[in-house]
């Protein structure tokens, strides 16, 4: 293509994504848009086409982002090229959303006509505004009997401050209003800015590993043009590769000769290691590099850590391979090897949040058929010592000796919880029980309130979300952002079995709830550990102080069975002999902790 053709083509490109709260109908709308633009034959069409992972289809949530190129003939008779980038809606995957928004010029904001605006909708709108996107409000599900589009329109204006007078009323399920949405995209979303003659700048917004072609980078071209055979350089790592293919997704991968400004597509360059294509990095030409990388987005830091161990220790290497493969597509997953006396060899993994953690575990068990034990999730603590040093602790067993600790700080989050009036009391109770500090309360309309709390991340990690949903009958929606570290009275609690510490059961807990938590765990272990030939004490300790204890009684043989009546001294002798034996056994005996006991303690909640 020459320069004029490229410029004409560029003016016809529209890049947009769809943002919404979970279940407001984002994936269904994407399906209808694909159908309307004839991207697929009727036969290929299936519900939630862009959610390609089994897990996504099963849970009905979008986890990974996806991109498609569509051709649309507008009412003005011109052919437009639309790039739809699908995004997840769940709080743990906000990062996936921010990546896809960075590759767009516009966003369709889908709001449920019955439920109105929810916490995640707001969080994503702010992300879109940060990226200066043109936002087109769409009120979806207007065919529901409980729909109230006028109220929702008012809500969009009041809460977000967008002009909703031209908001499209649609029903993705029934296919109402889809054409109006497409016309608005063509009309209101700006064409990509950028110059095809400038040095190449492509942003990587995702990557995927293909066993035959190596790493495939999903890119959005911001400036310049990239063709097969070009030598390209990754600006973050400085590594160079030769491009073997470029193309676009029409959901299927379709090869093209070149990608130019505004194109969203893929690039393969027989890259072996996914670490070389960091998400958010800029690709440029090796011969004529760009002066500086694009304002990439931040490196994502995991918030929640836990240990993953294979139940069958022989499968340690398989687990490593599984984690490496998942890491290829999941830039936020981090892991490093770790060993535990109780569980053997495994990995310490970092995740964005609890849903992310669950999904990774489920994918390992499903796709790689490895059974896992997971230790209790923990967060990163900063520990300041009396000698002036500070240590970062992401694993309770690395906590320094209590005598040498000056203070401990833990991460706090600002949680915004949207909830109907009737449940405000219940939500406040949960937040206070989780050591939350009340910050603010705002009424969105007559029926809904936003509560803002500062809560320690370690309390949210545990079972906050489940409690929130069950105590508000599922009506509360919840979003959080990290605000930094604050000092807390935290202690490390160890569990001793027969006076030996079990490292996998150590955890860090707030001093006020330490006693209760210790007591519950000790009782639970007493039920689950089988009786031994000797008496086994179970203790919960903080430093050298035992805060809770319980004892598993010994099994014993009736040594007096052979005595018919007879003298007490004879019986004494036999009983004392038995006692001696038990004592000796206790000093050398070791106690195996069964799998169920670990699982039960890790799953235990605070009540």
Swiss-Prot record:
It is a peripheral membrane protein. Its EC number is 3.6.5.n1. SUPFAM superfamilies: EF-G C-terminal domain-like (SSF54980), P-loop containing nucleoside triphosphate hydrolases (SSF52540). GTP binds at residues 23-28, 140-143. GO terms for molecular function: GTP binding; GTPase activity; ribosome binding; translation elongation factor activity. It catalyses: GTP + H2O = GDP + phosphate + H(+). Keywords: Cell membrane, GTP-binding, Hydrolase, Membrane, Nucleotide-binding, Protein biosynthesis. InterPro entries: EF-4 (IPR006297), EFG_III/V (IPR035647), EFG_V-like (IPR000640), EFTu-like_2 (IPR004161), G_TR_CS (IPR031157), LepA_C_sf (IPR038363), LepA_CTD (IPR013842), LepA_IV (IPR035654). Residues 11-193 form the tr-type G domain. SMART domains: EFG_C (SM00838). One of its GO terms (biological process) is positive regulation of translation. One of its GO terms (cellular component) is plasma membrane. It holds the Pfam family GTP_EFTU. It is found in: Cell membrane. PANTHER family: TRANSLATION FACTOR GUF1 HOMOLOG, CHLOROPLASTIC, TRANSLATION FACTOR GUF1-RELATED. Belongs to the TRAFAC class translation factor GTPase superfamily. Classic translation factor GTPase family. LepA subfamily. Required for accurate and efficient protein synthesis under certain stress conditions. May act as a fidelity factor of the translation reaction, by catalyzing a one-codon backward translocation of tRNAs on improperly translocated ribosomes. Back-translocation proceeds from a post-translocation (POST) complex to a pre-translocation (PRE) complex, thus giving elongation factor G a second chance to translocate the tRNAs correctly. Binds to ribosomes in a GTP-dependent manner. HAMAP family: LepA (MF_00071). This is Elongation factor 4. It comes from Bacillus cereus (strain B4264). The gene is lepA.
């Amino acid at each position: 293509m020459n320069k004029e053709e490229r410029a004409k083509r560029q003016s016809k490109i529209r890049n947009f994504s769809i943002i919404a709260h979970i279940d407001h109908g984002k994936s269904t709308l994407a399906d209808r848009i694909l159908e309307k633009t004839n991207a697929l034959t009727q036969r290929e069409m299936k519900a939630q086409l862009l959610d390609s992972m089994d897990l996504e289809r099963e849970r009905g949530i979008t986890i990974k982002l996806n991109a498609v190129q569509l051709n649309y003939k507008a009412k003005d008779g011109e052919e437009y090229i639309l790039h739809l980038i699908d995004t997840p809606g769940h709080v743990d995957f906000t990062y996936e959303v921010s990546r896809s928004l960075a590759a767009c010029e516009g966003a369709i904001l889908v709001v449920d006509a019955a439920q109105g605006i929810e916490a995640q909708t707001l969080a994503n709108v702010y992300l879109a505004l940060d990226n200066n996107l043109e936002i087109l409000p769409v009120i979806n599900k207007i065919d529901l009997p409980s729909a109230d589009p006028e109220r929702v329109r008012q809500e969009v204006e009041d809460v977000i401050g967008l002009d909703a007078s031209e908001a499209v009323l649609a029903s993705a399920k029934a296919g109402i209003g889809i054409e109006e949405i497409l016309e608005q995209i063509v009309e209101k979303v700006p064409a990509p800015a950028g110059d095809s003659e400038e040095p190449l700048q492509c942003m990587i917004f995702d990557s995927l590993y293909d066993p035959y072609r190596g790493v495939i980078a999903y890119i959005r071209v911001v400036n310049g043009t990239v063709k097969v055979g070009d030598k390209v350089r990754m600006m973050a790592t400085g590594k160079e590769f030769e491009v073997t293919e470029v193309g676009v997704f029409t959901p299927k991968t379709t090869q093209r000769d070149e990608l130019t400004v505004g194109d969203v597509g893929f690039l393969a360059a027989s890259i072996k290691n996914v670490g070389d294509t960091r998400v958010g990095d800029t690709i440029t030409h090796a011969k004529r590099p760009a002066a500086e990388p694009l304002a990439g987005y931040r490196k994502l830091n995991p918030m929640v850590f836990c240990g993953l161990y294979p139940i069958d220790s022989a499968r340690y290497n398989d687990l490593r391979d599984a984690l490496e493969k998942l890491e290829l597509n999941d830039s936020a997953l981090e892991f490093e090897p770790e060993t535990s006396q109780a569980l053997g060899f495994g990995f310490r993994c970092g995740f964005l949040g609890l849903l992310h953690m669950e999904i990774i575990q489920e994918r390992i068990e499903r796709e790689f058929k490895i059974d896992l034990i997971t230790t209790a999730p923990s967060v990163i603590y900063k520990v300041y010592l009396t000698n002036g040093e500070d240590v970062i602790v992401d694993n309770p067993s690395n906590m320094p000796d209590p005598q040498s600790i000056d203070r401990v700080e833990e991460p706090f989050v600002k949680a915004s919880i949207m909830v109907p009036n009737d449940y405000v009391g219940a939500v406040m109770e949960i937040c206070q029980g989780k050591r939350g500090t009340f910050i603010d309360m705002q009424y969105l309309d007559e029926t809904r309130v936003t509560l803002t709390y500062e809560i320690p991340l370690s309390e949210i990690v545990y079972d906050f979300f489940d409690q929130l949903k069950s105590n508000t009958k599922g009506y509360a929606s919840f979003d959080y952002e990290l605000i930094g570290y604050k000092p807390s009275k935290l202690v490390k609690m160890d569990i001793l079995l027969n006076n030996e510490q079990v490292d996998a059961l150590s955890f860090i807990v707030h001093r006020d709830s330490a006693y209760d938590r210790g007591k519950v765990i000790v009782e639970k272990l007493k039920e689950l550990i089988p009786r031994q030939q000797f008496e086994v004490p179970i203790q919960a300790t903080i430093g050298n102080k035992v805060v809770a204890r319980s004892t598993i009684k010994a099994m014993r043989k009736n040594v007096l069975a052979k005595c018919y009546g007879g003298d007490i001294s004879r019986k004494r002798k036999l009983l004392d002999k038995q006692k001696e034996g038990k004592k000796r056994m206790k000093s050398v005996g070791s106690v195996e902790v069964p799998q169920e006991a670990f699982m039960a303690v890790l799953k235990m909640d605070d009540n």
